[in-house]
């Protein structure tokens, strides 16, 4: 082969290779463009399928980057559609309660910057549970903690942390409040925050981080709310609020809120005489609350809320083993399901119970006179039979030698049923412990279980002599 033929042969081979490479690049480009614009259509409905009219909120939109021969292909991951909660699953059948969480706030305050709080509660969104409390605008090892036994000051704020995380200096202050309630409707958090003058307080309704609505005091006598979670069903949230005497007739109203906006207000009706600090839970299609009668009864009021027509009914827990403190001893206590028992009704403490068919699960202080100790049990017929007193499955949560305080319920949706959980406020400091000038709390949390369980006691556990004065 002469030199000219060699040159022609090499040129032909080079041209062929270049042509093949060019065609491969075109193929890669076409593939890239096709994949990019197709965007994995996430099971798009057929063109003739009717689409829902309600808005769809995209929780997150993740882009996954795949590298192929130095060519970048973007693949869209199907977004998760967030829906309102409806709580339509049945209630879990339980044998008792198992330990879930304890924040040890007071013990940690002996050597760290932890907020002074009271009125704690727990509420969950679809993924996590959070603890809330009303802060006093100060940490414990701080002179501002002196005399924090007072309930209503303008520096109190609603604190929010993931459950089990004590309220440290980095804790978020959700709103200004000396009375509050919070709940998640499936899309965002609603916070009801009350602050201001005793005779002219304001309730702010904060939804998804924005102030949406407000309402002023209607009886000019300490507007107040639940101090535990509200409940939302299909986008409508309900919260119980009271304004008026703490030891006489008061004006209780049930508010209905949609995305932070008040859409209806219903007055309390039924036989309950005095209603405060309700502990509410979803009982699809409605909401049920167990409350505090601070006037006439040591048996607890029941408020039933119809979420469809906004109607309200009220009565009292039937169990003759009553739930409030102070109360008569169990041999002489009574309840007829409809009326306050007029047994040591003045004063009281926030508490909880929930129905289980004809029976009732409940918690209360072990002491009938003081906020000391804490126990739970089931009363056979306690939801349907007047003055029923047959108690089973008793558990000690806090032994009688240690202090307790408020308690309340919260609900957690599982794969097949809705579980009931409760928290107990463990108060420390004044009035009882006069070595120190502050009043604060930690919490312990239990949840319903269908399994077996042991025994124990879970008090606050701080040595008051180790604490800042």
Swiss-Prot record:
UniProt topological domain (Intravirion) ranges: 1-9
Binding site for Ca(2+): 293, 297, 324
TM region(s), chain numbering: 10-30
Region annotated Disordered, chain positions: 324-350
Extent of Low complexity compositional bias: 333-342
An example Gene Ontology molecular-function term: metal ion binding
Virion surface-facing ranges: 31-469
Region (Involved in apical transport and lipid raft association): 11-33
Region feature Head of neuraminidase, mapped onto this chain: 91-469
Activity control: Inhibited by the neuraminidase inhibitors zanamivir (Relenza) and oseltamivir (Tamiflu). These drugs interfere with the release of progeny virus from infected cells and are effective against all influenza strains. Resistance to neuraminidase inhibitors is quite rare.
PTM per Swiss-Prot/TrEMBL: N-glycosylated.
Region (Hypervariable stalk region): 36-88
Keywords for this protein: Calcium, Disulfide bond, Glycoprotein, Glycosidase, Host cell membrane, Host membrane, Hydrolase, Membrane, Metal-binding, Signal-anchor, Transmembrane, Transmembrane helix, Virion
Protein name listed in UniProt: Neuraminidase
The organism of origin for this protein: Influenza A virus (strain A/Hong Kong/1/1968 H3N2)
């Amino acid at each position: 082969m002469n030199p000219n033929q060699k040159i022609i042969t090499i040129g032909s081979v080079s041209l062929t290779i270049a042509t093949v490479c060019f065609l491969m690049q075109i193929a890669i480009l076409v593939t890239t463009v096709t994949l990019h614009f197709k965007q994995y259509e996430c099971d798009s409905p057929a063109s003739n399928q009717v689409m829902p009219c309600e808005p769809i909120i995209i929780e997150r939109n993740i882009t996954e980057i795949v590298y192929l021969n130095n060519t970048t292909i973007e693949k869209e991951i199907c977004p998760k559609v967030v829906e309102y909660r409806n709580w339509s699953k049945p209630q879990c059948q339980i044998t008792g309660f198992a330990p879930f969480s304890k924040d040890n706030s007071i013990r940690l305050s002996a050597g760290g910057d932890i907020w002074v709080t009271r009125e704690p509660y727990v509420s969950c969104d679809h993924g996590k549970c959070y603890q809330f409390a009303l802060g006093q605008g100060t940490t414990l090892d701080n002179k501002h903690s002196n005399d924090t036994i007072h309930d209503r000051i303008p520096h109190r704020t609603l604190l929010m942390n993931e459950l089990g995380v004590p309220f440290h200096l980095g804790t978020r202050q959700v709103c200004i409040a000396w009375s509050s309630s919070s709940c998640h409707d499936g899309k965002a958090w609603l916070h009801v925050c009350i602050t201001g003058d005793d005779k002219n307080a304001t309730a702010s309704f904060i939804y998804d981080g924005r102030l949406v609505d407000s309402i002023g005091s209607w009886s000019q006598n300490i507007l107040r709310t639940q101090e535990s979670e509200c409940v939302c069903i299909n986008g409508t949230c309900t919260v119980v609020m009271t304004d008026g005497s703490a030891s006489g007739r008061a004006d209780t109203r049930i508010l209905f809120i949609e995305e932070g906006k008040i859409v209806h207000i219903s007055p309390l009706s039924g036989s309950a005489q005095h209603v405060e600090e309700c502990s509410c839970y979803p009982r699809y299609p409605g909401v049920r609350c167990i409350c505090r009668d601070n006037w006439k009864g040591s048996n607890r009021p029941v408020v039933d809320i119809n979420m469809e027509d906004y109607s309200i009914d009220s009565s009292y827990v039937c169990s003759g083993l009553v739930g409030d403190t102070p109360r008569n001893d169990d041999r002489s206590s009574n309840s007829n399901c409809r009326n306050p028992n007029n047994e040591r009704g003045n004063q009281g403490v926030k508490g909880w119970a929930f129905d289980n068919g004809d029976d009732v699960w409940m918690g209360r202080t072990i002491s009938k006179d003081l906020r000391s100790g804490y126990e739970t049990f089931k009363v056979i017929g306690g939801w349907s039979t007047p003055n029923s007193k047959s108690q089973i499955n008793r558990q000690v949560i806090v032994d009688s030698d240690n202090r307790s305080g408020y308690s309340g319920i919260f609900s957690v949706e599982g794969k097949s049923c809705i579980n009931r959980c409760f928290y107990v406020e463990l108060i420390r400091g004044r009035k009882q412990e006069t070595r120190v000038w502050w009043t604060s709390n930690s919490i312990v949390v239990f949840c319903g279980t269908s399994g077996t369980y042991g025994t124990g006691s879970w008090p606050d556990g701080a040595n008051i002599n180790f604490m800042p004065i």
